[in-house]
Amino acid sequence: MQIKRLFLLSFICIVSACTEKKITSENVNWPVYLGDKSSQQYARLDQINTENVTQLKPVWTYSTGDASDDNRSQMQCNPIIIDGVMYGTSPKVKAFAVDAITGKEKWKFNPADHDAHGENISRGVTFWQNGKQKRLYFASGATLFCLNAETGEMMADFGNNGSVSLKEGLRENDSSFYVASTTPGIIYKDLIIMGTTVSENSDAGPGHIRAYNAKTGETVWTFHTIPHPGEYGYETWPEDGWQRLGGANSWSGMSLDEERGMVYIPTGSASFDFWGGNRKGENLFANCILALNTETGERIWHFQTVHHDLWDRDLPCPPNLITVEKDGKKIDALSQATKSGLLFVLDRETGEPIFPIEEKPVPKTDLIGEETWATQPFPIKPEPFTRQKMTANDLHNFFPEYADSLNDLMSKVRTGQPFIPPSTEGMIIFPGFDGGAEWGGQAYDPETGMLYINANEMPWLHQMIEIEKENTQTDLLADVGKAIYKLNCAACHGQELQGDATGSYPPLNNVVERLKRDEVKHIINNGKGFMPGFGHIKSEEKEAILAFLFHEDTKIQPKDVHEIGKFSNEGVVPYTHTGYNRFLLPEGYPVITPPWGTLSAIDLNKGEIAWQVPLGEFEELTKRGISKTGTENYGGPIVTTGDLIFIGAAQDEYIRAFNKKTGEELWKYKLPAGGYATPSTYSVNGKQYVVIACGGGKMGTASGDKYVAFSLP
């Protein structure tokens, strides 16, 4: 009896010890973009925890070798890790595989060797396994590649010897559309479901959602986000909208409920972004969360977050699939964060709101031909995770010498409430064009029901400009090129060719000193970085732009001016705009009182913010006695059972670990370049790692080409 008691006591002690001691599994993958198909950005890993995170050190670095010298390349990839191998993409969108323990390269694939333009943005890759066969899918420009995941060689039985064109099947003359895919597709059985990036001007192609056979590359189904005749939502557009309008695309990824066979797809705005007089109506399915049947592509439900968008309020990230406890019941739901700083929480099965959502009146437009939608949806809960308006009272006084000029500017532009329509007078859009929330996504902890979200609180300035008619009296090709430039290029590169303040779009007033004429022509044709290719522009119009940029005095016959000057938007859109301009001081700081970047914890069961802290720091301001301001940030968080949140994203180029319960910053490490990507975490042979792409290249910071992995000693 005594022996039995001793044995029982020993057994209880062992069980108790196992319960209290946190154990990391031998091998835990990060097999899908953002961690899993439900986009939770969550890992059941706890070897690295609040007790030991300060001991975290770099254990390997992998250099891709192709960062740009002009600090304009980026690396936004969230790498996947499967069975000890990490797969990702480089600044020039080369796919690679490395050993996840050592960082040693296994193979690399260069799409440029296969006639694919590879200088757009890539956020990752998609893995599919059928028996022993392992395949990797990724897009470079408009080409979707299928590779042998073990060798990096193209799979000849997929599409056209290993690739398919994402331009095919869009519309007649689809080869002229700018099409790319910046975010990985998602796998359901033998399907890979893909969205695309398209132009944001009136030349945009349609944003079809398509499912391809993962074995053959054949198109299995297509969902028209601009409905065709007879399809649901057709009446929310002009009758011929499906033939001539574009956008309403899904560029930011998607989430999948495999048990229900439902895929949840966030969509962007219709094109042109800031004037919709030629697309009057509610514009379904732009700015929607779409729930589709994964087998057939049929619509199950939708929820539109912005009606008739005029503010470039694309849904920037895939929804998190979550479970909400409400009124004593557990409800399978989703949460969708927006650039506006709002969070929509919907029933996953029906699309019905979990918390009330109210349609509120918004201001009317005074632009020619435009008709704004009368109301917009505002969630009552959760409360916004950013401020919702900016007035002159919100200007900080860190640099008193600018007070008069800032107040003068504030008195001349429209501001002070959400959904102020674009105008020739100018407006402040807040939160800005890059959120609020952005493409890095949010981390959801299924154990606590807490959502962790990083956000920007940056005001941007915006002004519409009436398009000038061409000067038919000129005999210089450069004069025609100037008008074409202002219509197609000035929104990003500036009305005076000055570029943007952060360096994302370079100045062109010195392009003669930096690039050869043929190099500029290649970029116009194919695009580079954030710039799309301009395939829709006639060759004569491209020559006119080049004549303008290179100060050429080529003369043309007056009768040719009108033909060359039939610009893409003229007669379609009567306005262009001054571009995407952050409202910054000359020193580069936002003009609004901090915080400028935040990390928040939102209790999704209550619909309440549990805590919010600044994300990032300007050390020079902190030394002046100014509290941490936070910084603009890109890339998202991940959360673990070790009670930690890991996030890079901030302009100061640190990766950080926060206590998920309190928001306390526990650890930070200065990266070789900005970690403007969502990190991944995984375990191999019982050792947990955290890895992040350090591509930099945003917010005026240097570009990089390194992946850095961290672990405990």
Q: What are these model-predicted stretches?
A:
Residues 22, 37-44, 67-71, 96, ...:
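Short, solvent-exposed loop/turn elements at domain surfaces
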Residues 36, 393-407, 411, 417-422, ...:
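Periplasmic c-type cytochrome electron-transfer domains
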Residues 30-34, 72-92, 118-143, 177-201, ...:
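Repeat-blade elements of multi-bladed beta-propeller folds
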Residues 15-17:
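C-terminal motif of bacterial Sec signal peptides marking the signal peptidase cleavage site
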Residues 180, 262, 475-479, 483-486, ...:
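Extracytoplasmic electron-transfer domains, predominantly the class I c-type cytochrome c fold
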Residues 53-65, 95-115, 144-176, 208-244, ...:
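Extracytoplasmic/lumenal domain signature
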Residues 23-66, 81, 600-602:
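Mature N-terminal segment immediately following signal peptide/propeptide cleavage
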Residues 2-9:
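Sec-dependent signal peptide recognition
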